[in-house]
């Protein structure tokens, strides 16, 4: 059997067997411990998330121009007839139902969350696409990229949590703008940042076994880099390949800043980072968390001294754009980047599942070695796993930015 076909067969088996293996235990794989659902914290009045201006690449991106019914870009808008959403439609034109596909997907996801959070209550849209000029100049409502929302019972005590649910549903910017509604917006359909997977900037630094530091873009298969093992201990792990490599891509990153000691890590919103709620948690119990969910007050693991690991409190989260995006894969599935411990994986929330799914690729590299030169773009095996995952895993296993689109 050809190696590529064998690898394809093994990858399918790994994904099919993963749910059963995840039930076995106890295990010492990072992220394997069962944990209660993460507590959702409502947004405060006038708070917005992420904590950057709406029309920056770290949020929904720049304004691209008003869309009119007779313009070429009108075909970018699609109607939303989801029966679980109430549209106010005070203009009686159906305009509030029109939005970009990205906005529609996020809104449909939010509608499910609202019904789960408050049985008998539905999501209500008071404003969607605006063709009448009722909003401020360069409002994303003019492009169908923004909605103003409430709950169907108009209970203002729910609006802070509604805003948090909108963040969780994958809106690129959420603002508790008014006591009468929540404002949500998304990136443009053309935005490269809207399609970003899980990566780090190419100039971010990894630590080699000899103590030298090297930019991620310069990593070569076979080099050993500082990482973390399943017991939460520092180790040096073989670098195998890039799961994604985009040297020229303009990419939106989340920048996580810590103090005591001060560290700064840039990574894409869908990437996994190991997080705890307090500094006393053992390293092995830090949970895999999407970068977009990391908040000030959380603790991450950082490298100190001669390779030791310790917790550091997150004091700031902001957006930044950079050229180049790289997603290294190591044998342990973790990597220390700019002295912060991160996962090699993104899009899927379970570190253990991702590590198991990449077992055939690790075996392939052990037996046959990797290619000398890797081309740009998404690694074929990573793309294959994502397609298999979409068929086999429930949508809520994915980060909202990478979840399969709803069909309503």
From Swiss-Prot:
<keyword id="KW-0862">Zinc</keyword>
<dbReference type="GO" id="GO:0048074">
    <property type="term" value="P:negative regulation of eye pigmentation"/>
</dbReference>
<dbReference type="GO" id="GO:1902738">
    <property type="term" value="P:regulation of chondrocyte differentiation involved in endochondral bone morphogenesis"/>
</dbReference>
<dbReference type="GO" id="GO:0003406">
    <property type="term" value="P:retinal pigment epithelium development"/>
</dbReference>
<dbReference type="GO" id="GO:0010694">
    <property type="term" value="P:positive regulation of alkaline phosphatase activity"/>
</dbReference>
<feature type="binding site">
    <location>
        <position position="127"/>
    </location>
    <ligand>
        <name>Ca(2+) 1</name>
    </ligand>
</feature>
<dbReference type="GO" id="GO:0061053">
    <property type="term" value="P:somite development"/>
</dbReference>
<dbReference type="GO" id="GO:0003413">
    <property type="term" value="P:chondrocyte differentiation involved in endochondral bone morphogenesis"/>
</dbReference>
<dbReference type="GO" id="GO:0009880">
    <property type="term" value="P:embryonic pattern specification"/>
</dbReference>
<dbReference type="GO" id="GO:0045669">
    <property type="term" value="P:positive regulation of osteoblast differentiation"/>
</dbReference>
<dbReference type="GO" id="GO:0031016">
    <property type="term" value="P:pancreas development"/>
</dbReference>
<keyword id="KW-0964">Secreted</keyword>
<dbReference type="GO" id="GO:0000139">
    <property type="term" value="C:Golgi membrane"/>
</dbReference>
<dbReference type="InterPro" id="IPR001657">
    <property type="entry name" value="Hedgehog"/>
</dbReference>
<dbReference type="GO" id="GO:0035264">
    <property type="term" value="P:multicellular organism growth"/>
</dbReference>
<keyword id="KW-0217">Developmental protein</keyword>
<dbReference type="GO" id="GO:0046638">
    <property type="term" value="P:positive regulation of alpha-beta T cell differentiation"/>
</dbReference>
<dbReference type="GO" id="GO:0140853">
    <property type="term" value="F:cholesterol-protein transferase activity"/>
</dbReference>
<dbReference type="GO" id="GO:0003382">
    <property type="term" value="P:epithelial cell morphogenesis"/>
</dbReference>
<feature type="lipid moiety-binding region" description="N-palmitoyl cysteine">
    <location>
        <position position="24"/>
    </location>
</feature>
<dbReference type="GO" id="GO:0001708">
    <property type="term" value="P:cell fate specification"/>
</dbReference>
<dbReference type="GO" id="GO:0033088">
    <property type="term" value="P:negative regulation of immature T cell proliferation in thymus"/>
</dbReference>
<feature type="site" description="Cleavage; by autolysis">
    <location>
        <begin position="198"/>
        <end position="199"/>
    </location>
</feature>
<feature type="site" description="Essential for auto-cleavage">
    <location>
        <position position="271"/>
    </location>
</feature>
<dbReference type="InterPro" id="IPR050387">
    <property type="entry name" value="Hedgehog_Signaling"/>
</dbReference>
<keyword id="KW-0449">Lipoprotein</keyword>
<dbReference type="GO" id="GO:0005886">
    <property type="term" value="C:plasma membrane"/>
</dbReference>
<dbReference type="GO" id="GO:1903042">
    <property type="term" value="P:negative regulation of chondrocyte hypertrophy"/>
</dbReference>
<keyword id="KW-0479">Metal-binding</keyword>
<dbReference type="GO" id="GO:0031012">
    <property type="term" value="C:extracellular matrix"/>
</dbReference>
<keyword id="KW-1003">Cell membrane</keyword>
<dbReference type="GO" id="GO:0007224">
    <property type="term" value="P:smoothened signaling pathway"/>
</dbReference>
<feature type="signal peptide">
    <location>
        <begin position="1"/>
        <end position="23"/>
    </location>
</feature>
<dbReference type="GO" id="GO:1902730">
    <property type="term" value="P:positive regulation of proteoglycan biosynthetic process"/>
</dbReference>
<feature type="binding site">
    <location>
        <position position="132"/>
    </location>
    <ligand>
        <name>Ca(2+) 2</name>
    </ligand>
</feature>
<dbReference type="GO" id="GO:0007267">
    <property type="term" value="P:cell-cell signaling"/>
</dbReference>
<dbReference type="GO" id="GO:0060591">
    <property type="term" value="P:chondroblast differentiation"/>
</dbReference>
<dbReference type="InterPro" id="IPR000320">
    <property type="entry name" value="Hedgehog_signalling_dom"/>
</dbReference>
<dbReference type="GO" id="GO:0045944">
    <property type="term" value="P:positive regulation of transcription by RNA polymerase II"/>
</dbReference>
<dbReference type="GO" id="GO:0006029">
    <property type="term" value="P:proteoglycan metabolic process"/>
</dbReference>
<dbReference type="GO" id="GO:0005509">
    <property type="term" value="F:calcium ion binding"/>
</dbReference>
<comment type="subunit">
    <text>Interacts with BOC and CDON. Interacts with PTCH1. Interacts with glypican GPC3.</text>
</comment>
């Amino acid at each position: 059997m050809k190696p590529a076909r064998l690898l394809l067969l093994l990858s399918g088996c790994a994904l099919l067997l993963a749910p059963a293996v995840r039930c076995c235990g106890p295990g010492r794989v990072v992220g394997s411990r069962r944990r209660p659902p993460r507590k959702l914290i409502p947004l405060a009045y006038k708070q917005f998330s992420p904590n950057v201006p709406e029309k920056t690449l770290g949020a929904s991106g720049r304004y691209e121009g008003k869309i009119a019914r007779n313009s070429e870009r009108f075909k970018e808008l699609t109607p939303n007839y989801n029966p679980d959403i109430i549209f106010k439609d005070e203009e009686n034109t159906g305009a509030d139902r029109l939005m970009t596909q990205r906005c529609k997907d996020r809104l449909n996801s939010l509608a499910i969350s609202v019904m789960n959070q408050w049985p008998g209550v539905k999501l209500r849209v008071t404003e969607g696409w605006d063709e009448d000029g009722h909003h401020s100049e360069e409002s994303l409502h003019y492009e169908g990229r923004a909605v103003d929302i409430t709950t169907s019972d108009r209970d203002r005590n729910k609006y802070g949590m509604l805003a948090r649910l909108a963040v969780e549903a994958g809106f690129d910017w959420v603002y508790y703008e008014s006591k009468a509604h929540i404002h949500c917006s998304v990136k443009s359909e053309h935005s490269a940042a809207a399609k970003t997977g899980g990566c780090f900037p190419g100039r971010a630094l990894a630590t080699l076994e000899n103590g030298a530091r090297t930019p991620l873009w310069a990593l070569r298969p076979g080099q050993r880099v500082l990482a973390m093992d399943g017991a939460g201990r520092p180790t040096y792990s073989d670098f195998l390949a890039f799961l994604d490599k985009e040297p020229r891509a303009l990419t939106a990153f989340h920048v996580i800043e810590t103090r005591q000691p001060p560290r700064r890590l840039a990574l894409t919103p869908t990437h996994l980072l190991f997080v705890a709620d307090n500094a006393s948690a053992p390293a092995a119990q830090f949970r895999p968390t999407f970068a977009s969910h990391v908040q000030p007050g959380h603790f991450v693991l950082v490298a100190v001294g001669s390779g030791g690991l310790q917790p550091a409190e997150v004091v700031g989260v902001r957006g930044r754009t950079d050229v180049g995006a790289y997603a290294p894969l190591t044998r342990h599935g973790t990597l220390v980047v700019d002295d912060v411990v991160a996962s090699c994986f993104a899009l899927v929330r379970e570190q253990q599942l991702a590590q198991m799914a990449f077992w055939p690729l690790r075996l392939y590299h052990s037996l046959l070695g990797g290619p000398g030169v890797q081309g740009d773009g998404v690694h074929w095996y990573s793309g294959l796993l994502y397609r298999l995952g979409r068929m086999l895993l429930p949508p809520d296993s994915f980060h909202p930015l990478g979840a399969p689109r709803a069909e309503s």
